[in-house]
Amino acid sequence: MKKVLLINWDCYPNFATGGVYTWTKTLIDSMTDYEFIVINELSNPNSNGVYTIPKNVTSVIEVPIFGATRYEEFCKRDNNLQARILKTTQHVIKEKFIPLYTEFMKSVLSDRCNTKILADVIIQLHDLLVQYDAKKCLEHPLTWDIFIELLNKEPIYSSMTFKEALTAFQLIQRNIQLFSIEVPKVDIIHCSLAWLPSLVAVYAKKESSCPLIITEHGVAFRELLLYYNAFLFDEPSKVFWKVFSHNIVRVVYSVADVITPVCEANKNWEESLGADPSKIKVIYNGVNTSRFKPMQVERESTRPTVVTVARVDVFKDIVCLIQAINYAKAKIPDIQCLIYGTSSDLDYSLRCLKTVKDLQLEDHVKFMGGTKEPEKVYNQADIIAISSITEGFPFTIIEAMACGKAVVASDVGGVREALDGCGLLVRSRRPHELAQGMVKLLQDENLRRQFEIAALKKVRDEFTLEKCVESFKKEYENLSNVQTAREKKTAEVLIQ
């Protein structure tokens, strides 16, 4: 049985929610002839540690980035920590670690980053940090001195505030801890994103001499740009993180053998960021049409009902959805919106609740929490509305389509590829337009029925679970065959 190293971030198996979790679980559950080893980088070490995994998941490596200063504090690695600490002398730090750290930082902050050099430095840092203590190296005063020295060489970075510089240093420091992880030898590496957690794949690919596949659901760099523009108010910090992020993404793309975005929109972004077009092949997400299908369910009310299934966070723009319901209420006074989804952003959740209260929509907008039966939730709705400001190829849309529901959604990411010809598209962050779409679908029964039939047919023709899984099986087989041919050729050369 071939082994696959699957690299995630705040996802399977600890976080049983969201589209990437659905995709990961589906992939693992459907490919029982492969053995999976899962690495999940955790932003919070107090994340859920109680979960059920299938037999073909033989190991889960949980890596905390915050809340633990050593990987060994969280997971038992071996009995040699004390020996590694003692080996990590001043000489080792100054003569071995600092030169590599300096080269790494120069590369990630360069507007002309050589991705081959950066990949080589990452591999060398890994080779060093598995032998010594990463904590002593990363927390040595010289490491901070080098970081500040490099910032001061660039006029724009030199004007970063102390707080912003320290935050940047600590975030990078925490993620370099990843390089100290020893990963088992595998036959294929599969990353569910192209971002910091995927740097593990750079050295794991070298150690296992195996192919690497990257599946981006939402293009990490695009979503990072949205975050930086929304939450970073210090201009030098914005530039710092945009340059840093671009170079991290580029080095991950550069070592990949295959990149499988979930939609053409993501493919366009990846090409614009420097990914080799010959490596890219779109594989759309697929939905289980045996589970998600039109069905009769009990409804609590006969009121015109709009449903959304989404996390309550800024990227789903639930505030826009609430505002749209307020506009739609003028045309359909008894309209109601049921929002199914959890939230990890307390401030944004409170903002949503305040918006409902300020607009006096308590009788029209209800937060239902998460659901384990989304197929029933979709079938309770008259229509589905999605207000996101960024998406990849969202499961919530194809699941709704599979349930034979008409959808109105913001035209972002791969949403158009799903809804074209069978739903309404509106511009993001336009509550007036979203409201108009809702009203149109709710009042025009013929149009709604037309979209319901077209959506159901399109999902069954193009976006089934079977089609998605079969595509990944073919990619795994192709990569394995190519790798076998390489090994055979290498062996023949050695024999000669």
What is each of the regions a protein language model found here?
Residues 424-431, 440-445:
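Conserved acidic donor-binding segment of nucleotide-sugar-dependent glycosyltransferases
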Residues 296-327, 338:
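Conserved donor-binding/catalytic core segment of Leloir-type glycosyltransferases
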Residues 406-409:
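Short hydrophobic beta-strand element within catalytic cores of glycosyltransferases
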Residues 336-350:
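Glycosyltransferase donor-sugar binding loop
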Residues 253, 370-371, 377-381:
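Short alpha-helical donor nucleotide-sugar binding micro-motif in glycosyltransferases
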Residues 349-371:
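Nucleotide-activated donor-binding/catalytic signature segment of Leloir-type glycosyltransferases, i.e.
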